[in-house]
């Protein structure tokens, strides 16, 4: 999965997919009542990027729906996964469940079109704080009470705080999550970070009793760091330059071993050689 980083304006969806992304990451900010408000990152952000592009969240979802609904004039067949980077740092811990409920209702209405031929992409809810694990239950509860529990089949999870792998496993246990787990690891492209924790996450993914289904590394902008991440066995790389990742995947060393994921590749299934 080539994951376009910080896609917060509707026009950027086309831009990143046309560069080779089959997945995008979008920032979601919340207001003081835990309503998802804007697709917005703010400063500071990655080096070489504009940090301040934004859209009202529900409007962005409508644009995203068009980009992932077959038959729509804006449809991109290869855009198959969306990671919502949930900026829950502005919320109190006891608002996490409410944030999940409100997020689910926004998605149900504006992205899934109330279950009637909405967008088809798989969705990852990426949560920065382990203490906010109740967001997951709130999300599920809202979809169930609105009569669409089947949409949970399209939803996965990520705790993005680079916490100890054991602590992350524990948070999922408390959240009642078994499966659909992506594990991120990374740091802004302005700084360097080793691959030690990525290797631990990959080892957990490949063990018989691990909780992780997929591992992605961020933010990967250079050819060499792409090669290093692929050599470590990641399933996805988040990048500001999807064309760089696509180029490396075309190199003979990687062509035989990796391919770009399509809609038929289940993002919740651990890949077995």
UniProtKB/Swiss-Prot annotation:
Expressed by the venom gland. Glycans are attached at residue 250. It catalyses: an N-(acyl)-sphingosylphosphocholine = an N-(acyl)-sphingosyl-1,3-cyclic phosphate + choline; an N-(acyl)-sphingosylphosphoethanolamine = an N-(acyl)-sphingosyl-1,3-cyclic phosphate + ethanolamine; a 1-acyl-sn-glycero-3-phosphocholine = a 1-acyl-sn-glycero-2,3-cyclic phosphate + choline; a 1-acyl-sn-glycero-3-phosphoethanolamine = a 1-acyl-sn-glycero-2,3-cyclic phosphate + ethanolamine. GO terms for molecular function: lyase activity; metal ion binding; phosphoric diester hydrolase activity; toxin activity. The keyword Nucleotidyltransferase does not apply. InterPro entries: PLC-like_Pdiesterase_TIM-brl. The keyword NAD does not apply. Keywords: Cytolysis, Dermonecrotic toxin, Disulfide bond, Glycoprotein, Hemolysis, Lipid degradation, Lipid metabolism, Lyase, Magnesium, Metal-binding, Secreted, Toxin. Its EC number is 4.6.1.-. Its cofactor is Mg(2+). Disulfide bonds join 45-51, 47-190. It is found in: Secreted. One of its GO terms (biological process) is killing of cells of another organism. GO terms for cellular component: extracellular region. This is Dermonecrotic toxin LarSicTox-alphaIB1aiv. It comes from Loxosceles arizonica.
């Amino acid at each position: 999965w080539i994951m376009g980083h910080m896609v917060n304006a509707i026009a950027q969806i086309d831009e990143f997919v046309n560069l080779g992304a089959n997945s995008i990451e979008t920032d979601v900010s919340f207001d003081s009542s835990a309503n998802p408000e804007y697709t917005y990152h703010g400063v500071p952000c990655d080096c070489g990027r504009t940090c301040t592009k934004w859209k009202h969240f529900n409007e962005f979802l409508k644009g995203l729906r068009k980009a992932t609904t077959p038959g729509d004039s804006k449809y991109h067949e290869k855009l198959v996964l969306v990671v919502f980077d949930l900026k829950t740092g502005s919320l109190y811990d006891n608002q996490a469940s409410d944030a999940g409920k409100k997020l689910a209702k926004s998605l149900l209405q504006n992205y899934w079109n109330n279950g009637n031929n909405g967008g088809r992409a798989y969705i990852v809810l990426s949560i920065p704080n382990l203490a906010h694990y109740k967001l997951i239950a709130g999300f599920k509860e809202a979809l169930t009470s609105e009569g669409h529990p089947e949409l949970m089949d399209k939803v996965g999870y990520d705790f993005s705080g680079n916490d100890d792998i054991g602590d992350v496993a524990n948070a999922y246990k408390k959240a009642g999550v078994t499966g659909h787990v992506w594990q991120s690891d990374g740091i802004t492209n302005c700084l360097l970070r080793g691959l030690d924790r990525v290797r631990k996450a990959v080892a957990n993914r490949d063990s018989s009793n691990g909780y992780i289904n997929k591992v992605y590394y961020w933010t990967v902008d250079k050819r060499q760091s792409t090669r290093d991440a692929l050599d470590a066995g990641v399933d996805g790389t988040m990048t500001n330059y999807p064309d760089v990742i696509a180029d490396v995947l075309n190199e003979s060393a990687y062509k035989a071993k990796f391919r770009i994921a399509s809609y038929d590749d289940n993002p919740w299934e651990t890949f077995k050689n």
